[in-house]
Amino acid sequence: VTVTISPAELADLPAIAALLEEMDRFYGTTDFEPPADRVTQIQAHLFRDHPTAFVLLARADHQVVGLASYSFLWPAVGLTQSLYLKELYVVASHRRQSIGQALMQRLHAVAAETGCSRVEWTADAGNAGAQRFYAELGYKVADKLFYRVEGEDLNR
């Protein structure tokens, strides 16, 4: 199987929407907006003058089988920027085929090309598969805590 990694394009919107829905189902989401709304939201974030985020897509035999979504954060070490990986997902049928590793390697290249001093991300504490994947690639757990405010708490 030949795998290619490339930046998402406008024509990829339906595939991105389907992949994100599959990922959300993997994490237990059961309530979804209509597909057309999802495509509109994705387009609004990825394909505007100053995108909120960027997506790399993995394709196997011309079929989208994985994605990495990321943004840039500033400041990082020495007033550089960091690349923040928000989501890394590979469809179940294509896991354990080095696709996730290929996406991570491409992220490393993007970070280097854009002057980032590091790549950072989180993994769910209960996602043993993700933790095993990152450990197999030699990544170390950072000594950080992750905080979140959401929903109605944003109004206080």
Features from the language model and the residues they span:
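Conserved acetyl-CoA-binding loop-helix of GNAT-fold acetyltransferases
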Residues: 90, 96-109, 132, 136
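A conserved beta-turn-beta hairpin within the catalytic core of GNAT-like acetyltransferases
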Residues: 73-85, 95, 142
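Conserved GNAT-fold acetyl-CoA-binding loop/helix
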Residues: 17, 21-44
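A short beta-loop-alpha structural element at the N-terminal edge
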Residues: 4-18
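A short helix-loop-beta-strand connector motif used in the catalytic cores of GNAT acetyltransferases and
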Residues: 45-56, 84
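Conserved beta-strand in the GNAT
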Residues: 57, 63-72, 89
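Conserved active-site alpha-helix within GNAT-family acetyltransferase domains
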Residues: 101, 113, 125-143, 149
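Conserved GNAT acetyl-CoA-binding A-motif
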Residues: 112-122
